[in-house]
UniProtKB/Swiss-Prot annotation:
HAMAP family: Ribosomal_bL9 (MF_00503). Signal peptide: none annotated. Belongs to the bacterial ribosomal protein bL9 family. This is Large ribosomal subunit protein bL9. One of its GO terms (molecular function) is rRNA binding. Gene3D superfamilies: Ribosomal protein L9, C-terminal domain, Ribosomal protein L9, N-terminal domain. The lineage of its organism: Bacteria, Bacillati, Cyanobacteriota, Cyanophyceae, Synechococcales. One of its GO terms (biological process) is translation.
């Protein structure tokens, strides 16, 4: 059986690992695919230092994004309630429905910060009233906001 070599991955590879992982692979696989396609680097002390530095920077950036999401969650809770005006019939039933795009616009008007509509989970809203809406701000931070739908 051939000796295995260690390489540091430069990108995520489904069958091997994630960016920055040190993995052992067959020499031919390393030489003919990973190294030639520049998907990995041969392990040396200087390469390991570079990888550690890059991973530390990545972790620091991720922590900053998480803290920003937590701060924005606090700001959303401070605001309390967001209101959306929709056209309704006489019985309070909406013409149409309230979408995550509508909620995104309401948040942007109140906070001047844009939230991607795909990160907002809105229940089925077909009439006026008060509702709870989930807003995913980060992979680990989700805010619940109060939404009031008002008819004209």
């Amino acid at each position: 059986m051939a000796k295995r070599v260690k390489v540091v991955l430069k990108e995520d590879i489904l069958s091997l690992g994630k960016d920055g992982d040190v993995v052992e692979v067959a020499p031919g696989y390393a030489r003919n695919f990973l190294l030639s396609q520049q998907k990995a680097l041969a392990v040396t002390p200087s390469v390991l230092k570079q990888v550690e530095y890059r991973l530390a920077k990545k972790a620091e950036l991720e922590a900053a994004k998480k803290q920003e999401a937590i701060d924005f969650e606090t700001a959303l809770k401070t605001i309390g309630r967001f209101s959306i005006k929709k056209q309704t019939g006489e019985d309070g039933v909406l013409f149409g429905t309230v979408t995550n795009g509508d909620v995104s616009e309401a948040i942007q008007l109140a906070t001047q910060k844009e939230i991607d509509r795909r990160n907002i989970i809105v229940p089925e809203i077909h009439e006026t009233g008060k509702y709870k809406v989930q807003v995913k701000l980060h992979s680990e931070v989700t805010a619940e906001i109060n939404l009031e739908v008002i008819g004209n």
